[in-house]
């Protein structure tokens, strides 16, 4: 196992450098001149533009800019934002903890609720509960996220008053609970349907019939032989979904006025703030890489047939 982890860590190195190079190249190739646009209605003089470009190393060749960016990344010196006095690192440190907390809560919601409802639906395949949750999951998948957000805001926040309608500057568990449900709603539906299909299929498998013939209790058969095997594809989906949740929280953060990664990254893209865009997306790449590694390590725990040399 240790050799496998070491090998995967070595494989992550070229993936990381390749992804960051691609991101930097895409930002470098964006049309327009964000430096010239800093003056707004008034045009900046060529001398001022050259001075600003020199301060951001924009006067150097692309590969030199990229190497300087990597140097700053490894020394935690990400430079200044093009459209503000704050450093990129300060903005990143302020925004990422909020989105990480929101994404983990959304992941927990879709995992607990999706696996729970999917397990019941798979065991009772063809019954009224199975039909009901399948229809509801299709509705959740079909309805846009912002509609789900506004509906929950009105029902849970306004009519019932159970949860806050919006989040503050430093949102806690209560303020993030409803946004987490909205963010994880679509993934919850997919986890439910995936779990339901896997459980229903494993219930008719030969190894399950053999376990029952040996006299094992129903609970042991369900947990060890059915649920454990059914969770392998579910864990794959959840692991890949963590990065997608963090990168796709723009709509949810906008609905609930959350100052996280989504809104900050969207604003940086609109403004052409290259240092901000590159730094934020680089962290997202790291999240994807690490989450995929953790998923691979969980396989061996869930499926005894999987062994890493």
Language-model regions, residue ranges each:
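Alpha-helical transmembrane segments of integral membrane proteins
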Residues: 2-4, 90-129, 145, 169-309
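Residue-level recognition of pore/gate-forming positions within transmembrane alpha-helices
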Residues: 12, 42-43, 138, 154, ...
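Hydrophobic alpha-helical transmembrane segments of membrane transport/permease proteins
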Residues: 15-67, 160-178
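Juxtamembrane/transmembrane-helix interface segments of polytopic membrane transporters
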Residues: 19, 23, 27, 149, ...
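Membrane-water interface segments at the C-terminal ends of transmembrane alpha-helices
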Residues: 22-29, 57, 71-72, 135-164, ...
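Hydrophobic aliphatic residues
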Residues: 26-30, 38, 42, 73-74, ...
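An internal, D/E-rich "acidic patch" concept
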Residues: 59-115
């Amino acid at each position: 196992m240790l050799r496998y982890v070491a090998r995967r860590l070595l494989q992550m190195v070229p993936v990381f450098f390749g992804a960051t190079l691609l991101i930097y190249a895409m930002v470098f190739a964006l049309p327009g001149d964000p430096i010239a646009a800093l003056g707004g209605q008034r045009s900046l003089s060529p001398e001022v533009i050259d001075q600003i470009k020199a301060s951001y190393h924009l006067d150097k060749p692309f590969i030199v800019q990229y190497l300087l960016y990597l140097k700053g990344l490894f020394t935690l010196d990400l430079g200044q934002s093009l459209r503000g006095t704050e450093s990129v690192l300060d903005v990143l440190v302020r925004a990422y903890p909020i989105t990480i907390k929101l994404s983990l809560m959304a992941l927990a919601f879709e995992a607990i609720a999706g696996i729970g409802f999917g397990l019941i639906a798979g065991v009772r395949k063809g019954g009224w509960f199975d039909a009901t949750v399948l229809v509801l999951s299709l509705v959740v998948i079909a309805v846009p996220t912002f509609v789900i957000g506004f509906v929950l805001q009105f029902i849970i926040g306004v009519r019932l008053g159970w949860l806050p309608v919006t989040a503050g500057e430093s949102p806690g568990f209560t303020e993030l609970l409803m946004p987490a449900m909205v963010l994880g709603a679509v993934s919850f539906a997919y986890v439910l349907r995936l779990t339901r299909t896997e459980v229903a299929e494993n219930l008719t498998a030969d190894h399950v019939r053999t376990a029952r013939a040996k006299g094992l209790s129903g609970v042991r058969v369900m947990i060890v032989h059915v649920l454990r095997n059914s969770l392998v594809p579910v864990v794959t989906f959840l692991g890949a979904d963590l990065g997608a949740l963090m990168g796709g929280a723009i709509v949810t953060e906008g609905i609930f006025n959350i100052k996280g990664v989504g809104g900050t990254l969207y604003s940086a893209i609109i403004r052409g703030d290259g240092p901000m865009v590159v730094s934020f997306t680089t962290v997202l790449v790291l999240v994807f890489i690490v989450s995929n590694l953790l998923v691979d390590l969980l396989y061996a725990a869930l499926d005894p047939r999987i062994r890493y040399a």
